[in-house]
């Protein structure tokens, strides 16, 4: 994303990536321009599809479109998903087809839509990660001071 993450955010990210690496049995970590790194990862792994959680900031939407274009050129399926919202920003509209600008009418309309039933998690085929990328420590995410874990 844009901007620099603070110490607490970097500490959290370091430990979240470590837990994910443990759960998956490996994790490829890359640093660089996102689209170039994804092309490199696809080439190294032979992936036939990539998926990611959708972000809604304008720069992230533009990045997602670029990734789709890159992957289509490589013959790789690319798809983003809603990961954290009950409703996508474009799903709840006024009767005139415009976004709501006042919360209470939005809330009423959103409640009428209901909440989709969660789908079960897919089964994943886990493979050994390729010899590609950086170690978690190479990313330099875990600051030494202050100790963000003290008292937890």
For every predicted segment, state its role:
Residues 1-115:
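Trp/Phe/Arg-rich N-terminal binding region typifying the photolyase-homology
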Residues 98-152:
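Glycine/tryptophan-enriched, flexible segments
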């Amino acid at each position: 994303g844009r901007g620099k993450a603070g110490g607490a955010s970097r500490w959290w990210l370091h430990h979240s990536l470590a837990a994910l690496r443990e759960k998956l049995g490996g994790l490829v970590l890359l640093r660089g321009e996102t689209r170039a790194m994804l092309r490199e990862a696809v080439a190294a792994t032979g992936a036939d599809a990539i998926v990611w959680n959708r972000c809604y900031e304008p720069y992230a939407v533009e990045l997602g479109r670029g990734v789709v274009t890159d992957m289509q050129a490589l013959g790789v399926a690319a798809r983003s998903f809603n990961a954290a919202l009950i409703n996508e920003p474009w799903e709840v509209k006024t009767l005139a087809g415009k976004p709501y600008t006042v919360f209470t009418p939005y809330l009423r309309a959103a409640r009428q839509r209901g909440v989709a039933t969660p789908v079960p998690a897919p089964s994943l085929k886990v493979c050994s990660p390729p010899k590609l990328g950086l170690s978690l420590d190479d990313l330099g995410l875990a600051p030494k001071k202050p100790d963000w874990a003290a008292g937890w």
